[in-house]
Amino acid sequence: MSSKQEIMDDQRFRRVSKDPRFWEMPEKDRKVKIDKRFRAMFHDKKFKLNYAVDKRGRPISHSTTEDLKRFYDLSDSDSDLSDEESKVLDEKRVKEKKKQTKKETKSKTPIEEKKKETKKTDQKDSINKNDLNNSERIQKMKNSHKSPKIDSEVSPKDSEESLQSRKKKRDTTDLSVEASPKGKLRTKDPSTSAMVKSSTVSGSKAKREKQAVIMAKDNAGRMLHEEAPEEDSDSASELGRDEESEGEITSDDRASADDDENEDEEEEEDGEEEEEEEEEEDESDDESDSGPDLARGKGNVETSSEDEDDLADLFPEEPGFEHAWRELDKDAPRADEITRRLAVCNMDWDRLKAKDLLALFNSFKPKGGVVFSVKIYPSEFGKQRMKEEQIQGPVELLSIPEDAPEKDWASREKLRDYQFKRLKYYYAVVECDSPETASKIYEDCDGLEFESSCSFIDLRFIPDDITFDDEPKDAASEVDLTAYKPKYFTSAAMGTSTVEITWDETDHERITTLNRKFKKDELLDMDFEAYLASSSEDEEEVEEAPEGEDGVSIEDGKTKKSQKDDEEQIAKYRQLLQVIQEKEKKGKENDMEMEIKWVPGLKESAEEMVKNKLEGKDKLTPWEQFLEKKKEKKRLKKKQKALAEEASEDEIPSDVDLNDPYFAEEVKKIGIKKKSMKSAKDGATSEEETELEKQKAEMALLVMDEEEDSKKHFNYDKIVEHQNLSKKKKKQLMKKKELLEDDFEVNVSDARFQAMYTSHLFNLDPSDPNFKKTKAMEKILEEKARHREQKEERLIQAVERAQQDTGKPAQKQPMDPALSMLIKSVKNKTEQFQARKKQRIK
């Protein structure tokens, strides 16, 4: 303490006690307050990491939990209190302390109180007697040692010497008592024992008074006269004699006074304890008046039990809700067995679908691994709760009173509890090809957050002997990743303070489809699908209806619809193949039959088909044109063969005798046939003749392509070399007749190569080192520049037309009035039917 006082008295360090920069931060402000949701990190093994060596390589035994406790602490309710409430708390604590001290004093028996009163009276009598004796001795000392220079002052040295001499004498008396036989002494008079008692009791207080006299600092007391030590020695000798006489008395009565001294010591201890309690009460009163001194560390530390009691007085107790934050899988048993099936639990099933999980797990599967399917099944708990909710709604909503405010904490936490339970209504089964792929997915995805949804993936292995008899709510075996769009959502119960109940929430996919902007064609298709149906579909539905069982859920109907769609597509493909085969058969036959089915919009569809056929001839690709040419060649060959066979039949062999009557008749028949053929040809219409001429012209063109002898091979590299030669070398090659002249002319207007002028893929770069300048290349570049100029002119003209036609309304294509009236009538009838249905429900 003395060293600290010296440091504080030093002027160099005096600023430390007053400057707040040198004050230590209290623990409440030093640690970061965290919510009780994160208390698992203090005891959970996932957050614990033991250190064997520190950063300098020295061996230590340290863990991360110690670091967490060093920097983090659970939030106390005191941190949220205001200043006025904290004052009220301090006052209550002081009052409670006073009450406790009063209760302790009252709890003592009245016999003990009487004993204390008697002891106190004895102490007071002994103190008075000692005071009288001490005052007489002091007067004797003053009378015997009167000096001219010092009147009423005692030197500290003399007082110390006198005390030491007294102590020595008392020690000798104690030794004499101990040395006496059997350690027992008899007292003759009771007065002497009383004197001994009074002297022993008052010993402690007399010592205190003498020490106070010695410690008194006085300048006059230090400046003593030279004769003072002699006088002090005389006075000390006289005092020693008096003490010897007293010592004899005490030695005679020592044995009888031992018991009394022990009692007196106990009384002194009781008295000291009472004084300490009174001092503590005074200090507490002072603290309550002045308040806690936080700068000196007073009032900082308070017991948690007192804080809780005080808070319980201020705030009424509320029903506690312990949510399983990130601990929904704490009850799941742990097993070492790895299987090829995984269960996905505790997810937001109102938003997630099977295809979302399949897309996720496909991105985490190992090389060569396959995820066959993902199916979502309802759990037993979910089935029971959903049945109850269909009848009376969620139980948690019924427990909330109607008059409860919107921001009521208890009602909000009840809704949160319901949302947590709703995560267990379903579970998904992921089927993999092998246990290795399942374990890889488990290691990578278990505990992972799905996007930014605040819902964490809880994976568990499913034993091989477990089977699932329920029909799945949703299933997915394939996902088109090119067209798949991920879902971005946040579950309110897990991530926000405000809770939104999802019991009667509309399907989010339905909301997105309704909010999407549709085109006119899409709307018409939707109207056709919704309001118009063929009779065959109705019959199929009627046939399939009795096969199903009663009480089929909506989810089962969805799966059946998907199966029906697949079957319908297969049936359509089969019908198309049959129609194609029938058409081919009918084309071969002479008698043609036609079937006409009246369908809404048949006229428009027929017109479109005709246009497509007419435009198809112009839009044929080079390959299709080549195939058509081949077909025409085959047809020509067949015709030539037929003509040759007819000619061979017409030819008459040389061995035949025309004079023979049999052969003469046959020759006449052949002549008649030829005449009939000629007459048939003559009777042909002019239209047939024109068609025949066209066919002949096309055939001539085809034959010309094959019969052209002007075709020749060329070497492009040699042409480029000869073109870049000098004039002398060209003349030399001309003489030798080895110069290759580039007679090839590019057909720039060929429609097959129009992409060279429009597409960036066929761009010609003259700065490229592989570019070789020829006449054909120059023509292509010129044509490209011409196309570019034409395009710019067209754009300018289009802009001018748009500016002129801004005021003119766009002409709409007229729709078939009969079809539009049919759709409108069906719409009106459905609206009327729904309106009547609503009125009945009300």
From Swiss-Prot:
Q: Where is the composition biased (Basic residues)?
A: 631-641
Residues bearing Phosphoserine are 75, 77, 79, 82, 135, 155, 180, 198, 288, 290, 304-305, 605, 648, 654, 686, 726
Q: Where in the cell is it found?
A: Nucleus, Nucleolus; Nucleus, Nucleoplasm
Q: Name one GO cellular component term.
A: nucleolus
Q: Where is the composition biased (Basic and acidic residues)?
A: 64-73, 84-94, 102-128, 148-164, 555-564, 785-795
Cite the record's note on assembly: Interacts with ABT1. Forms a complex with ABT1 and suppresses the ABT1-induced activation of polymerase II-directed transcription in mammalian cells. Disrupts the interaction between ABT1 and TATA-binding protein (TBP), and suppresses the ABT1-induced activation of polymerase II-directed basal transcription in vitro.
Residues bearing Phosphothreonine are 303
Q: Species lineage, top-down?
A: Eukaryota, Metazoa, Chordata, Craniata, Vertebrata
Q: Which organism does this record belong to?
A: Rattus norvegicus
| Function noted in UniProt | May constitute a novel regulatory system for basal transcription. Negatively regulates ABT1.
Q: Which residues form a coiled coil?
A: 772-804
Q: Name one GO molecular function term.
A: RNA binding
Does the entry feature the keyword Transport, yes or no? Answer: no
Q: InterPro entries, from UniProt? A: Esf1, NUC153, RRM_ESF1
What sections of the protein cross the membrane?
Answer: none
Q: Give GO terms for biological process.
A: rRNA processing
Q: Into which family does the record put it? A: Belongs to the ESF1 family.
Q: Could you tell me which residues carry N-acetylserine?
A: 2
The protein's name: ESF1 homolog
Q: Where is this region: Disordered?
A: 54-317, 534-568, 631-657, 674-693, 785-816
Let me know which tissues express this protein, per UniProt. Answer: Ubiquitously expressed.
Q: Which domain of life is it from?
A: Eukaryota
Keywords assigned by UniProt? Acetylation, Coiled coil, Nucleus, Phosphoprotein, Transcription, Transcription regulation
Query: Where is the sequence biased in composition, kind Polar residues?
Result: 190-203
